[in-house]
Amino acid sequence: MWIGNGISELAGAFGTFCNSLLIYEITGSTWALGSMWLLYFLPSLILQLFIGPYLDRWSRKWMMIFALWSRGIIFLFPLIGFVSDTLVPWHVYIVQIIIGLITPIYSPANQAILPNLVSKEQLSSANAYVEGMARLMTFTAPVVAGIVIEYIGIGSTLLFICTALMLSGCLLLGIMEVREEKVERKTWAVEFMEGVRYFFQQKTIVWLGIFLAFVQFGVGVTMVINIPYIKTVLNGNNAMYGYFMAGFPLGYMFGTLLVGKIKFQSRRRLMLGALLIGGVTYINLGITSSLISAIATEIVAGITMAFFSIHNITLCQQTVPNHLMGKIISVRSFIIRAMMPLGVLVGGALSELWGIRPLYILIGAIITTVSLVGLLIPYFAFLDKESINKNKLAA
């Protein structure tokens, strides 16, 4: 499973890289690039909203295999179009829609199946191996994809993606899944509303979600403008784009190594201070004319985001009772991820009107302002509490 996950993460990152380049090279439009991401996020969000309560009722192993094989097959579509020189934007859009529908199936099934494969004592180590591999692939893929596409072309890269995804699905066939007996469950509406009610009763979760939502909005904007930023504004090539995209995950990896070693008296100052620095990195991207400076800025952004994200997750885990964790995370993820399509929409529209640099500065200004509000207003002192009182959910 560990090897299969690694291969699928690498192939998925390659696929995202190829799709983005194909759309931008065919159209030359940031609006078209934004439309591609909207067609990924909107079906993904809709399915995530409805499928959550049903995932535990199906075989997680076969859901994962189905998702991987489906992704491998669907990437044949742009491959055939590219080789036959008939590729048009809607070919890539179809791929994005289907991948958007598959992702809410694969990701939670991948996380949920692990406790069935290892003992409780080994679970922490197993999660570390899986997450470590995912981070490594996230860091490696942009660099490798940029170099590979530069030297062997997009067609050969698409063929590799199809093969790798099919292979990763085959590797999961050996998993011996232990399934629990079916029990009577509440309806989807009851379970969903239960999670929504509890979510909005907890101001810690709500406000951390709001802070993170602003970050995700910025991420959505950069999904549209990163390619033209490197290739047009900074005059880089595909390999340079790969180095730039690898900067953030590389910084994030460094950040995860530092988080546990840095002692703090105020969690609020640590988290929101990191978010403030992250906002400044966006502003620097809007100003700098150096590709090396841009890559270094992304590394710093990754380090700071690791501090904010890990403490954000920790506070959420401290707040939510175990029996509600799945529902709350599902609701929280839906609300946060919903900001990304908005960012994509804004990025696609305003980049055509304002240009690329002003958008980076705008995102940075928004994130730094939100961070300063959280740092300076005494109301947010509740983020420093070591223990958080849990409200009991009414039956």
Where are these regions (language model features)?
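Helix-loop boundary and gating motifs at the non-cytosolic
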Residues: 1-43, 201-246
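Helix-loop junctions on the cytosolic side of multi-pass membrane transporters
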Residues: 112, 116, 158-186, 376-389
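Alpha-helical transmembrane segments and their helix-entry boundary regions
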Residues: 1, 17, 32-36, 63-64, ...
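C-terminal transmembrane bundle of multi-pass solute transporters/carriers
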Residues: 46-49, 57, 61-63, 67, ...
